[in-house]
Amino acid sequence: MLKIAETEFGSRLFTGTGKFASGKLMQEAIAASGSELVTLAMKRVDFKTGSDDILAPLLSRGVRLLPNTSGARNAKEAIFAAELAREMLGTEWLKLEIHPDPKYLMPDPMETFAAAKELVSQGFKVLPYVHADPVLCRRLEEIGCAAVMPLGSPIGSNQGLVSREFLKIIIEQASIPVVVDAGIGAPSHACEAMELGADAVLVNTAIASSADPVRMARAFALAVQIGREAYLAGLGSKSLHAHETSPLTGFLNTGLSTTGLVDSGMAEKLL
């Protein structure tokens, strides 16, 4: 079981709610994914009613909501969005996102760290979306973040684990959950992240924008399970050289000698 902030999750696949063609399709895809933690952009919530057209169905499914601060350009805006989320949705869980650049949506490390520090002090369970920066992730852990969410590649790019080598370092040194987020465009990318030792992945665009989101959600669920099993089993090490899986000549020598067809000396000469 995956544990984040003392809460256990049976599924290591987290999903988003954006880009689906309809609310019904979104609900069906989330159900097919088996996800128990679903992120929701605060900018989509109607603060007059405290809801949007998808909030009630999500709550009825029993999933935990992870409101995010997507659209915030600095720490001040992110903190304001977090406080609204706590008041309107009744949750202290938060995916912290601060990306002032609308073209590449790269997370701002300085503003993210400042906001995370303040929000943790207010009792929030902060899951910050960040660059795959091992130093930053370590600092975020030190100030009390519940998990870190380093990117695989830019949001919605479907490029996969471009930051692979840095993710390995983050995973190796972290003592809090590492959730690979952004850029995961295929089930094979999710499987690879889990094989590296990530605790979970968050996927939205690859599911929502596929021709069959429900089937794609199932595919991602299977990929995450397979990747986790492979990691737990222990992957073989890589090598530049070939390594035989069975003796190359010894069995022939033994076989020729024991059958009596030739003596051992002749067997050596034949081989």
UniProtKB/Swiss-Prot annotation:
Family statement drawn from the similarity comment of this UniProt entry? Belongs to the ThiG family.
UniProt entry tagged with the keyword Cytoplasm: yes
* Top EC class of this enzyme: transferase
Question: GO: which molecular function terms?
Answer: thiazole synthase activity
- What keywords is this UniProt entry annotated with? Cytoplasm, Schiff base, Thiamine biosynthesis, Transferase
**EC number assigned by the record:** 2.8.1.10
Name of the protein in question: Thiazole synthase
Q: What is the stated purpose of this protein?
A: Catalyzes the rearrangement of 1-deoxy-D-xylulose 5-phosphate (DXP) to produce the thiazole phosphate moiety of thiamine. Sulfur is provided by the thiocarboxylate moiety of the carrier protein ThiS. In vitro, sulfur can be provided by H(2)S.
Q: Which gene encodes it?
A: thiG
Q: According to the lineage, what is the superkingdom?
A: Bacteria
Q: Does the keyword Cytoplasm apply?
A: yes
Could you state one GO cellular component term attached to this entry?
cytoplasm
Q: Assembly and interactions?
A: Homotetramer. Forms heterodimers with either ThiH or ThiS.
Q: Which GO terms describe its biological process?
A: thiamine diphosphate biosynthetic process
Q: Which residues bind 1-deoxy-D-xylulose 5-phosphate?
A: 156, 182-183, 204-205
Q: Which InterPro entries match?
A: Aldolase_TIM, Thiazole_synthase_ThiG, ThiG
Q: Which HAMAP family match?
A: ThiG (MF_00443)
> Active site: which residues?
95 (schiff-base intermediate with dxp)
Reaction(s) catalysed by this chain, per the record, are: [ThiS sulfur-carrier protein]-C-terminal-Gly-aminoethanethioate + 2-iminoacetate + 1-deoxy-D-xylulose 5-phosphate = [ThiS sulfur-carrier protein]-C-terminal Gly-Gly + 2-[(2R,5Z)-2-carboxy-4-methylthiazol-5(2H)-ylidene]ethyl phosphate + 2 H2O + H(+)
Q: Where does this one sit in the cell?
A: Cytoplasm
Describe which pathway this protein belongs to, using the record's wording. Answer: Cofactor biosynthesis; thiamine diphosphate biosynthesis
